[in-house]
């Protein structure tokens, strides 16, 4: 469960950091949004290094599914737009793949 929690921390940090840039450039918010945004992106990068994986590529691949799930939760809770059935189906497929990568047996590795 610690792995999933770390992936969720990374996802929230990345989405929050990227949203700060979105707010500045697309929603006409103050450039001061970039200060917490950059700190959040640094937290995201740090969190991914805490994943229990010997290979960065595998950690990033598994993260992708968790990122998609978290992005759609963000869209719903922060932006007020509920995911549709295609968002949900795509998320189920991606998270299923991420879970296979995270929990799949690694013979000899």
From Swiss-Prot:
Localisation: Cell inner membrane
Membrane topology according to the record: Multi-pass membrane protein
Residue spans crossing the bilayer: 4-24, 31-51, 59-79, 88-108
Annotated Gene Ontology cellular component terms: plasma membrane
Listed InterPro entries: UPF0060
Domain of life: Bacteria
Alphabetic keyword roster: Cell inner membrane, Cell membrane, Membrane, Transmembrane, Transmembrane helix
Database matches in SUPFAM superfamilies: Multidrug resistance efflux transporter EmrE (SSF103481)
Family the UniProt entry places it in: Belongs to the UPF0060 family.
Official protein name in the record: UPF0060 membrane protein RC1_3291
């Amino acid at each position: 469960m610690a792995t999933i929690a770390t992936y969720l921390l990374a996802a929230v940090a990345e989405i929050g950091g990227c949203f700060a840039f979105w707010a500045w450039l697309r929603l006409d918010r103050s450039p001061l949004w970039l200060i917490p945004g950059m700190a959040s992106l640094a937290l995201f990068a740090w969190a991914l290094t805490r994943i229990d994986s010997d290979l960065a590529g595998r950690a990033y691949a598994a993260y992708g599914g968790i990122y998609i799930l978290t992005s759609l939760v963000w869209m719903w809770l922060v932006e007020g737009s509920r995911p549709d059935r295609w968002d949900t189906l795509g998320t189920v497929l991606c998270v299923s793949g991420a879970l296979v990568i995270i929990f799949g047996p690694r013979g000899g590795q």
